[in-house]
Amino acid sequence: MVFRKLGEGDVAAYLEMATDFYNSPAVLHSIPQNYIENTAKAVLSGTPFADIYVFEENGAAIGYGLLAYTYSQEAGGTVCWLEEIYVRPEARGAGVGAAFIEFVKEAVFAARYRLEVEPDNTRVKALYRRHGFSPLAYESYVLENGKKQ
């Protein structure tokens, strides 16, 4: 298995997988397709705020991971958000998500690694705990800006 950064030739597979992710129980709601497209464009243009990794096995894209970067005084430095981890249904249960988490911990330097999970997704919560994550007792709040980038 190879984890590599998104390239131009990966965009169609990424769009398909991200669309599937946002139409699954792993998220609270779907998002407009142009948000997914804009993320790919931003990453390919070299934004310093995000990376997309393609999970490749035997020449086929079997998943992706979206990372986002921020700075946190509370964490004492850079925070790497594991925003999305998606594995195609036929590749699930083979340790792909676990391998990606370990890859990120080794390849991406950060003072803190952070992620979110649906409250009832006990299987994924167990995976995260096995890899050293623990719950952070904050509630999250958002304010949507009508001016999209």
Regions found by a protein language model. Name each.
Residues 87, 93-106, 126, 130:
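Conserved acetyl-CoA-binding loop-helix of GNAT-fold acetyltransferases
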Residues 54, 60-69, 86:
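Conserved beta-strand in the GNAT
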Residues 1, 59-64, 80:
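Glycine-rich phosphate/pyrophosphate-binding loop shared by adenosine-nucleotide-utilizing enzymes
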Residues 2-16:
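A short beta-loop-alpha structural element at the N-terminal edge
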Residues 41-54:
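A short helix-loop-beta-strand connector motif used in the catalytic cores of GNAT acetyltransferases and
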Residues 101, 108-118:
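Conserved GNAT acetyl-CoA-binding A-motif
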Residues 92, 114-125, 142-148:
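Conserved beta-strand-loop-alpha-helix junction that forms the acyl-donor binding cleft
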Residues 15, 19-42:
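Conserved GNAT-fold acetyl-CoA-binding loop/helix
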